[in-house]
C-alpha cells in the first residue's frame, strides 16, 4: 500500500490566471487562505470558528476533507470514505483528445445540444455534450486538451468546466493536461496542440543542441505560466527517451542519445514546470505557477527495433543489442526522480507501449511496459522507489478482455489508465461486487490526487 502522505486532497477548486474574466469570486479567510468559488456551481462558503471554507458537497456543514486546516492524511481519508466505486474508477481514467471547440467529424468529434458546433450557436468555450457526459456520468476528471481556438477560449472553457464539476457530487475539480504545445508545427496526435498563439520554442533535439539546462529550465518556467493561464495543470512531457535509434520517427522530440545530457535537460525541464517562483510558491516548491510534469516513456522509448514505433504493432519491441538498458532509465532515476527543488520528483511517469524484450528476469514475461509487473512494480515502484502517478499510454488496452484488464489493474501498480470507462465497469462487474476497485482506494486514488492537487490546489498548499 502506498503511504497516505502521498494522497493529496481533490476537493479544492482550480485557479487560473484568468479567473477574473468570468463568474468566479474569491474570498480570503482570517488566516489569509484564499478560496475561489464558481458562482454557478451552487457551492457556498461556510464559516467555522471565524475561518472560511467551501461546502463542496453542499451538505451545509464542514466535512474533514473540506477543512484546509487538517493534515493531508486526515482530509484524504475522509474524502476516500465518501467516494463510490464509480467515482474511484473515474479518477483512474483519462479522456480522449479534446479540441476546443470540438471538431465536427473524425476522431474526437463532438456536439453541442446534439448539433455540430457550426450549427449550435454555442460559444467556442462551451462544454460539449460528450464532455458533460464523461464529467458527470463517468466521473472522469483528467482531460487531455489539444487544439484550442485561442488562449482566451481555452481559459474560459476551463472556468466553465471547473464551475460544472464543482457542482457535482464531492466537488472534485478537473485536471486539464496537454502534450507539448510550444512548437510551431503539429505533426501527430502527441503534439496536436502545437502551433497556437503562445510562445514558440525549438523541439527536443534542437534544445539538446544548446547543451544548456538553464535555458531548458527557463523554457519550463515560461511555458508553465502559459499553461496555467490556459487552465492546464499537467504537462504530458518531457520526453526523456534516448535517441539511440536514428530511424525512429520520434527522435526529433528527444534531447539527445547521451544519458548524461538527457538526464540534465529532463531534470531542468521538470524543475521549470513544477517549481513556482518565490512570490508564487505556497509550499514545497508548488504554487500558483506550478504544472505537474509527466515524464515519458518509462523505461525508455528510444530503442525501437528497426526504428519502428510502438504506436503500431510493427514496432512493439524495444531491444537492447548492446545491453544498455540501464542507460535508458538513467534520465528517470538520476534526473526526473531526483530534483533539486522543493517538488522533489516528477509528479507522474508514463510507460511506453513497447515490450522491453527479454528484460523481465523475475516473471519471464514479454508484455507491454504498461502491463508488466516487473517493469512497473519491481523496477519503478520497488527498486527505484517512485511513488508518484503512473499513467498508461493512450488506448494501450483496447483489445483486452475484462479478465485480463482486471488483473492488469489489480497487479500492475498503475494509477491512471487511458481506457474507455466501460472497461473499468466491466472489470468491476467481473470482480463480483467491485472489491477489486475498492482495494484501489489507498493506492490509485492517492496518487491520482497528486496531479489534481499538485499545484496550488494541493492540500498542503491550502
Task: List where the protein language model places each region.
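Bacterial N-terminal signal peptides that target proteins for export
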Residues: 1-8
